[in-house]
Regions:
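Extended polysaccharide-engagement surfaces of secreted carbohydrate-active enzymes
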Residues: 1-391
């Protein structure tokens, strides 16, 4: 809501928040009100936009803000190519349900005082999922505000088509926890459920991120590792290394949900975008097959009027293991038309050339001692300087 921007602006004399609030009021509020299905509507309820507005707070341009920001509590990394209107924007998240502090303190209060504070139906089960937009045009998408969530509604990593213990329910995380508690009894540990970020590095335009989320998958799957490593340089491209390790054999899947429809190419897929087409290629340590399908997501906007629905179409491209595997690595590569990026994968090493730089990404064997596979990144700039990163 706009009122939140104005409250932050007034409370902290924050000119950035004031600029955002004014921008939404002038450019987007009328359109949102016209499209809203909630009665009586957002304009009759906009009292706080008036009460919290402080005209003495001066707007401040965004140019002095960083292009990368990591929010530790949520395990959320947000990236921008610039603060211009045509900027590319990317975010990825991996953490405890509701955030680390809420998860930790909620269980403490439940144990000490017997009060159940958990209500996570608005918190999406989307560890390692990501969102990308360019110049205000969305590439990836998700289910939005949907009452009952399915595993492939987000750009997550699936094991035998599953992500959590429960699915097709309103509160996926807490329903899954209830099932887990029934199975494990007193052995259930809240600390072992959810995900965490094991590495974040931002050096200039280079951003590297690694999240681990094996804890959310059903116990009987015996997942030892489900990791995603992100590498990007100023959002001129982005790469994922998706890593699966288990004591059992499974079919693993990487999901790519998008607004534009993917078009098959000789190598990979092309996504037509007004702001510049995107090329998508997947390499894997084991044979794969792909599936394309549409998801029709129907959301009830308010329980007061359940016939007022929001319908969303998601184009899904799923890359799956061809046969069950105990371990498998997928490299996902996103490059842009006109960038002349070159991508190949040889002997387990992903090799990308872009803007005169060379990026080499390798994944080693699973290390039971640390609970994950070693990942190494080598970046050579302008054919000379080389930097190495252990992730």
């Amino acid at each position: 809501p706009v009122c939140v921007y104005y409250k932050v602006a007034a409370e902290y004399r924050n000119g950035h928040a004031q600029k955002l609030g004014n921008m939404v009021v002038k450019e987007f509020l009328a359109q949102e009100a016209a499209n809203s299905k909630v009665k009586p509507g957002i304009l009759p309820e906009a009292i706080f936009e008036f009460l919290w507005y402080d005209p003495s707070v001066e707007e401040r341009e965004f140019d002095d803000l960083p292009l990368a920001r990591y929010f530790e509590d949520l395990g959320l990394l947000a990236l921008r190519s610039s603060w211009q209107r045509d900027a590319r924007v990317f975010s990825i998240k991996c953490g405890a349900p509701g955030g680390a502090k809420q998860w930790r303190e909620g269980w403490k209060i439940l144990q000490d005082e017997g009060i159940d504070l958990f209500s996570l139906s608005h918190h999406h089960p989307d560890n390692l999922s990501y969102i990308f937009a360019s110049g205000g045009e969305y590439f990836t998408c998700e289910d939005g505000y949907n009452r009952n969530l399915m595993p492939d509604n987000h750009n997550v990593l699936l094991v035998d088509g599953r992500y959590t213990d429960a699915q097709d329910v309103n509160d996926v995380y807490m329903t899954s926890v209830e099932q887990r508690q029934k199975e494990e009894g007193k052995d259930f540990s809240p600390e072992s459920y959810g995900g965490f970020v094991s590495c974040v590095k931002v050096e200039g335009n280079l951003a590297v991120y690694r999240g681990e989320t094996a804890g959310v998958y059903p116990r009987h799957m015996q997942m030892q590792e489900v990791s995603r490593v992100l590498v990007t340089d100023g959002l001129g491209f982005w790469l994922f290394a998706d890593i699966f390790n288990s004591q059992k054999s499974h079919i693993y899947s990487v999901i790519c949900n998008t607004d534009p429809l993917p078009c098959p190419q000789e190598k990979g897929y092309r996504y037509p975008m007004e702001t510049g087409d995107i090329r998508y290629q997947v390499f894997s340590s084991a044979p794969t097959e792909t599936r394309q399908y549409e998801q029709q997501v129907v959301s009830v906007m308010t329980t007061q009027e359940q016939d007022k629905l929001c319908r969303t179409c998601i184009h899904t491209l799923s890359t799956d293991s061809q046969t069950p595997q105990t371990s498998q690595v997928f490299f996902e590569c996103f490059t842009f038309a006109g960038s002349e990026a070159k991508v190949c994968c040889q002997q387990g090493m992903l090799h990308l050339e872009w803007n005169g730089n060379v990026y080499k990404l390798t994944v080693g064997e699973y290390d039971a001692g640390v609970g994950r596979s070693p990942v190494r990144l080598r970046v050579t700039r302008d054919g000379a300087e080389t930097a190495e990163y252990s992730l």
